[in-house]
Amino acid sequence: TMEGARKHRNYALAVLFVVYIFNIIDRQIVNILQEDIKADLGLNDTQLGMMTGLAFAVVYCTMGIPVARIADSTSRKGVMVVSLAIWSGFTALCGLANPIHIGTFTISAFVVLLITRMGVGLGEAGGSPPAHAMISDLYEKEKRGRALALYSAGLYAGTLLGYYLGGWLSEALNWR
């Protein structure tokens, strides 16, 4: 029925909106926690900049187009589910960043964190491109702009929540 299709569209949009909020929270929270991370791991400002910006952004920007192409040729929903799992897993691994000792060789906590932030960027690259395509598939031209605007509001909601949660975590717990 038309009512069922409308509910399905709106439910899908709500799920995409919530996923986008979490996507943005993850990007913003690290900015609030960076001084705690810097102190805990003994990072310098260059390392901090690489971890918060470069490591994430290079992979995110580089992988966005290939991931979008995969989403267009396979299952958009499937790409989003896999991407969500990747970025969630790597986000959790960020909190476990410690030096790794392999015999006499040591991988520094900075390198571990850099690699995990790159993994987060890889996962998050599969968020918005398939979401935009799914919204375009679900909503007819006359309603598509509003649907995309609602989805995009997740950016601002995620930023607000990311800064709030980051501040709270920094005071109440620790960055890990």
Say what each PLM segment does:
Residues 28, 56-65, 125, 159-160:
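Residue-level signature of mid-helix packing/kink "hotspots" within the transmembrane helices
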Residues 36, 65-69, 168:
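Membrane-interface helix termini in secondary transporters
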Residues 62-105:
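Conserved MFS/SLC helix-loop-helix module at the cytosolic interface between two early adjacent transmembrane helices
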Residues 112, 116-156:
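Cytoplasmic helix-loop-helix junction between adjacent transmembrane helices
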Residues 11-45:
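Extracytoplasmic
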Residues 33-62, 107-111:
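Extracellular/periplasmic helix-loop-helix junction of adjacent transmembrane segments
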Residues 151, 155-176:
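Helix-loop-helix hairpin linking two adjacent transmembrane segments in secondary transporters
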